[in-house]
Amino acid sequence: MAYDRIRLFEEMEKQFEGKNEQYFRDLLTHQDNVVRTRAVCILADIAGENAIKPIGKVLKDDDNALVRHEAAFSLGQLGYTSGIAALADAVRSDPSLFVRHEAAVALGVIGSEDARKTLDAALKDESVEVRESAVVALANLDYIKSTSSSSRFTKLTGG
């Protein structure tokens, strides 16, 4: 498996250099969760806002918590409000606290008031890590609201 994965990574690098979005969309359902994790991150990098829908589907449907976590992280890093619905759903209902935590952080990074209701509800999550992530994310929303600033600083400190 490791050798096959390395060979695939070599091909992935070539496809990355060619910015082949469809290639990485297809890898989002690959049997190897390591490949899916990489595909999520690379698709976010090369596709921008076009990556929101397929990465949101990974966040909702992938059976591996690490892959879903990376999907949440990538949606936050992309920073588009079109990713909020998928992230909010993950905060509310993902079975993994690891994913709920990252989705809450990602909502803070996006920095939109549209996420406030979800983050307020996350303050009552059963997991202390999710609750703490919601506090940090809400602090960023408060800062953005009070300063009317949505800068690189707020994106880096949003979660």
Predicted regions and their residues:
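Helix-adjacent hinge/juxtasegments
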Residues: 63-81
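N-terminal alpha-helical scaffold/docking segments in eukaryotic complex subunits
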Residues: 1-37, 41, 45
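Amphipathic alpha-helical scaffolding segments comprising HEAT/armadillo-like alpha-solenoid repeats
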Residues: 15-29, 48-61, 80-92, 112-124, ...
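Core register positions within helices of long alpha-helical scaffolds
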Residues: 11-15, 42, 74, 106, ...
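Solenoidal tandem-repeat scaffolds enriched in leucines and small polar residues
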Residues: 126-137
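Register position in tetratricopeptide repeats
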Residues: 45, 77, 109, 140-143
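Alpha-helix N-cap/helix-start positions at coil->helix boundaries
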Residues: 2, 18, 33-34, 49, ...
